[in-house]
Amino acid sequence: MRTFQWELVIKIMKYDFDKIIDRSGTDDLKHGVLQQRYGDANLLPLWVADMDFETPQFITDALRKRLDHSLFGYTMMPENYWKHIAQWIEEHHQWRPREEWMTYIPGIVKGIGMAINVFVKEDEKVIIQPPVYHPFRLTPQGNHRQVVYNPLIETPSTEGQGGRASYSMDFDQLAEVCDSKCRMLILSNPHNPAGICWDADTLRRLAHFCHERGIIVVSDEIHCDMALFGNRHTPFASVSEEAAQCSITFGAPSKTFNIAGIVSSYAIVPNDSMRRRFYTWLEANELNEPHIFSPIATLAAFTPEGEEWRKEMLQYIEGNINYVIDYCRNNIPQIKPWRPQASFLVWLDCRALGLNHQQLVDLFVKQAHLALNDGEMFGKGGEGFMRLNIAAPRNVLTEALERLRWSWHHE
């Protein structure tokens, strides 16, 4: 029944997510560094977090219209730009940030690095919650700040969770490792790689803990518009006044609309003194000025047409997730995909295969000829996992899973 229903949905979709896009000649990262990263340029890449779907035409049309003008001098931010973004956030997440709280940043990882340099001295510390997006560790370390680890607790699959394994925050351990040198906590919300939409109670508790201790929470919310299966994203700064006053939120349309190469990120800082300190630094270094195409792409995305595309894309993503879960259950039951609540990234629990780290990587890379992110790069708790990007046409996923099935059964 599920297959029939999904086929029916595909037939009535306006947009074609089954279309194969040839990315050769575009210098795309997903294919371009396979030899350097994996030692094989001919792998099927399902690793870096951009989509293999065509960027929607209403965005490319807006960019072409500006290109037709043929003069690309200095530009200013379009009128009502921040009002437009604030309205989108309010419509989707029931929280409206004030326009004066917002500014452009040249990428979220860059924004994290900038915030670290502004607010954390070199002898101070940054807390992260592994397994988590690896730049949360690399960026503080690269800026000569000590990283403090507050590992998430795995919560096994239960009926109460709809059969979904997940993670929870360990507040007891957080209290143990947090000392007076801890100045910042980097939060992944929704969580990457496990796709968790953190609930308001958890975020409120985290906000209270950090606010009491003068810790700034940097909340990476880049996957916020990709909540799945009826789940909802909760902006960290929305859960309490304490959360608002101790937080820096980063967001962008790049994941949702597949425009990562057009850097359209933004920051939201409700606290007046924090905002003055951070935004003055950004302005002094001219890091709050977007390139000419960023506002154009964002304004084209955050429209009723963009909302229609987003909803269809999420339907397709949900179908891909169901397909991966069903395929593994029926063909490779030792691999247990965690059903994400948000994003197009699926956390594959491969521990039942009984392989060590190198054997697991070799199974995917050398035998199945697939490029995924291995779990160890996400830190403690990621051992035995692989991160799969399922934002691809169904035929591509089928090919990948068939390769994996054949490789495992012929091990």
Where are these regions (language model features)?
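PLP-dependent enzyme catalytic core of the Aspartate aminotransferase-like
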Residues: 11, 175, 243, 354, ...
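N-terminal small-domain helix-loop-helix segment of the aminotransferase-like
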Residues: 14-107, 114, 302-304, 411
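Conserved core of the PLP fold type I
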Residues: 72-208, 225-226, 233-238
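Helix C-cap/helix->beta junction micro-motif
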Residues: 143, 212-213, 243, 368
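Conserved core segment of the aminotransferase class I/II
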Residues: 241-318, 325, 408
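Conserved glycine-rich beta-strand-loop-beta hairpin in the small C-terminal domain of fold type I
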Residues: 299, 316-325, 337-350
